[in-house]
Amino acid sequence: MTDLFAVLDLPRRPWLDAEEIKQRHHSLMASGSFSSPTLLNEARRTLQNPALRIRHFLALEFPEYQPANRPQQDWDFFLKVGEATRQATELAARKSSLTHPLARAALQKEILSGREALSLLKEEIGKRLAAADERLQAFEKNPEALASLAEEFAFLQKNETSVREALLALDQGLA
């Protein structure tokens, strides 16, 4: 397995500054001295994403580690995000299928309400990601805790993407 931390000449640790990763990648690409731009890009993609970075760190530092059990996520929150994004997608589809301006205007209140709910969820996800990032910065060399944190990041990033896409669909519905 290629050590992607070494590819970008970064310290091997679960938390890295995103700006430092970007700057290192850009300087190595600009120097032209690196033989494989694909490997540089893979290193940046992996190390830029906290969940992927933690998993890569675990694979390098604890190659024999197998998680004892899958960490529990906040499934109530997941269901809340799922319901809000489903409603937003349905609203956007309903609005795009309407041709009469008055019928479209009648949905505006629902669309604005859905957008507000999604914005609150996006804010909550941002807070949870920031809290997870703080815990990652103060990491212990505990593979179980790191694996749990990687799952949490992946869970939150997936929800963040869903909310962002639903907001985009609603924003297009506002036009």
Protein language model features and the residues they cover:
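C-terminal accessory/regulatory regions appended to core domains
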Residues: 1-175
